[in-house]
Design a protein with these regions (language model features):
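Core nucleotide-handling region used for phosphoryl-transfer chemistry
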Residues: 1-380
Length: 380
């Protein structure tokens, strides 16, 4: 039985996100990408919305790149609880790499590499890496248009937590574009071996079918790995991250401080924290509620700033006129965001600009108080 929705055209998606402001269709010129800006409790409860984390369509609206669907940590959702899992079902356990997801995007000249957001600086670093490695291009071009090969880019230039000693682009999955089906691990190894493409390693489960014991073993691992992914043969996936990895993201032990809670939310690390709060449901519920309120406030703020930008840009498309004739006449508190958006030339950058601004201004209580107006004066 298929567990993923069939997707061929952007119109297969749009009705499911029409009334969901957390999802955005970004026009990138020769392609469009559908992504989520924030994640609410029910954002991914719909199988179609669960696909909206980097779907890419060409100018005609045809699906051309389908990366991973949204999946969760063990214990993060009711349907990923330990009681709901059965390791006697066919599955493979894979090392969870600590890098950036990379996938190809077909184009007129062949393909570009992209992250969840499309062609980005991180993706261009991966493009430089494969420029003198024709085996990657040959492999990708063989699969292009029907399949999406999914890689992880690990590099000290792009270090998250785990320190990899060399740059590498490692194949983690191959997905059928239209159906969303994930090709089996053994088949991936065989086809990747033909082109000498590195493939993510499997992890031995010495606890057999005892999922609780296995999860605890993974969480007790050291600091040189992020964790594992349990991938069932039907495509269902779950993450288990090591406790050390999560703690190094400053999650569990620091939620007493507002600045740390804000950092967890802004760095999209909440999903790492929640499974470790199972023993403290009141803390878990409180931080989920706060994150939802915070993300809604940021969404509303970005909507306001984007509207201001679009109004001014329509009248004054030249940078100097925009600054002198428009920005000087709006509330000065919006000026830093409007100037940065002008550099990008569109309102799609607003969320990233606001997020980076807040990250730089939450390391002390006084700084948090100075930017609190941005998120509707919420307090942890």
């Amino acid at each position: 039985m298929a567990i993923f929705p069939e997707i061929n055209h952007i119109n297969d998606i749009l009705p499911f996100i029409a009334d969901r402001p957390e999802f955005k269709v970004a026009d990138k010129g020769w392609y469009s990408v559908i992504n989520y800006m924030v994640a609410y409790d029910d954002s991914f409860d719909c199988p179609v919305r669960a696909e909206c984390r980097g779907l890419i369509f060409d100018k005609s609206g045809n699906l051309i790149s389908r990366p991973y669907h949204k999946f969760f940590n063990v214990g993060e959702k009711s349907y990923t609880s330990l009681d709901s899992l059965d390791l006697s079902e066919p599955h493979v356990v894979l090392e969870k790499l600590d890098g950036s997801m990379i996938r190809p995007i077909p184009c007129d000249t062949g393909f570009r590499l992209g992250t969840k957001a499309g062609v980005t600086d991180v993706a261009m670093n991966a493009e430089v890496f494969i420029a003198d490695k024709p085996n990657y291009s040959n492999f990708i071009e063989t699969l292009l248009n029907t399949f999406t090969p999914i890689f992880e880019w690990v590099s000290r230039k792009n270090r998250i937590v785990v320190d990899y000693d060399k740059d590498d682009l490692i194949l983690t999955a191959i997905r059928v574009n239209s159906t969303g089906h994930y090709i089996g691990y053994d088949a991936i190894r065989r086809v990747a071996g033909i082109y000498n493409i590195p493939v993510v390693n499997t992890v031995e489960n010495k606890s057999s079918d005892d999922i609780s014991k296995f999860v605890m073993t993974i969480r007790d691992w050291g600091d040189d790995v992020e964790g594992i992914i349990i991938r069932f043969d039907d495509g269902r996936m779950l993450k288990v991250k090591t406790a050390d990895y999560v703690l190094r993201h400053k999650c569990k032990e620091s939620i007493r401080l507002e600045k740390n809670v804000l950092s967890v939310i802004l760095n999209d690390s909440l999903d790492d924290l929640l499974p470790l709060l199972d023993s403290s449901p009141s803390d878990r519920d409180r931080i989920v509620e706060f994150a939802n309120d915070f993300n809604l406030a940021i969404f509303n703020f970005c909507d306001t700033v984007s509207n201001l930008f679009e109004e001014g840009y329509a009248k004054y498309p030249e940078s100097r006129d925009f600054a002198v004739k428009y920005v000087k006449n709006v509330d000065p508190k919006y000026a830093p965001f409007l100037y940065k958006m002008m550099k990008s030339g569109n309102s799609n950058s607003c969320r990233d600009i606001v997020t980076e601004y807040l990250k730089k201004n939450i390391n002390t209580k006084n700084k948090v108080n100075n930017v609190r107006w941005i998120f509707n004066d919420l307090s942890w």
